[in-house]
Amino acid sequence: MNHSMLRVPGVASLALALLFSAPLSAQETQLSDPEIASVAVAANQVDIDYARLAQNKSKNQDILEFARTMAKDHQGVIDQAVALVTKLNVTPKDNAVSQKLKADADKTRKSLNAKSGKAFDKAYIDNEVAYHQAVVSVVEGTLIPQSQNAELKALLQQVLPVLKTHLDHAVMVQGKIGG
């Protein structure tokens, strides 16, 4: 049995706090489509920022490859979301869920930035596993069900399998580096 998930380091703890707090906040508050767009863009930007940090700090090829994929894929989702909200003439609206997401990410980035070498690699990939678990949960359980616009809902449904693939990739890398 893999006991590493039982000993959650500080960085992953923050991501797990997001897992349990952001989805609950989103479920308790009906989000409008502009608010959903804001959460989606924020969630993708957060992971791009994590990836850039990993690209600057890690020397591990598995981590670097994973980070490149995250930066590229999540930027692609942001580009699609921006194109959609532009087409729909909708402005993403900041809200409690997107604000909490960004605040938690700032804390996580600071914690990650304080680490180096193998400790950084482990903390980064542990965070990525927890973060993608949280994002999959929010997209699946909150954002898709609450989306009113068919095109926004379709975009979220299209992105969900990619997020699940990211989670699987993160778990694989975590196993390779001893996460």
List PLM regions with ranges:
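His/Met- and acidic-residue-enriched segments that coordinate or traffic transition-metal cofactors
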Residues: 2-12, 18-179
